[in-house]
Amino acid sequence: NIPPEFKLLESLLLETETGYFLLERHLERLCDSARYFGFPIDAASVRATLEKLAHGVKGGSKARLMLSSDGSVATEIEPLRDTGNPTGPYIAFATTPVDSANPFLYHKTSNREVYRCELEKRPDCTDVIFVNERGEVTEGAVSNVVIRNAGLLLTPPVTSGLLPGTFR
């Protein structure tokens, strides 16, 4: 029983010159989540909707796609915000660990309460980094965690309880 307000989400970077960044990976992740939650999805229709949304957009933008349980798609687009240079702490660790067994951590959905709550606790920060019940770093509320070590880019394993980012 899925409430009607529950949706699957994708947030995509749209650049005037190159189009959607990692579009195929976003569509693949959306289709995987649709299968998991039993949402009907027409990937070709989703692609056409995104292409129509991009038409005439100038400059970098953030596109947001929402898939409902009946298969309908809604979109929004907004210019990229300049976060500037924050004064004070940029990030903090979440006060409560996440449960790596929580299936919602592995899918980008409208069920984002855990992220919202932790961000609200730290209005001085632009992001909050989560750890799981084993103390493993997982992800940020609005970002992926990427560590550069000896020329390699390392990310936490998805099994730690995090969204399978498209840039992994």
Residue ranges and their predicted role:
Residues 1-62, 66-168:
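Helix-start/capping segments and mature chain N-termini
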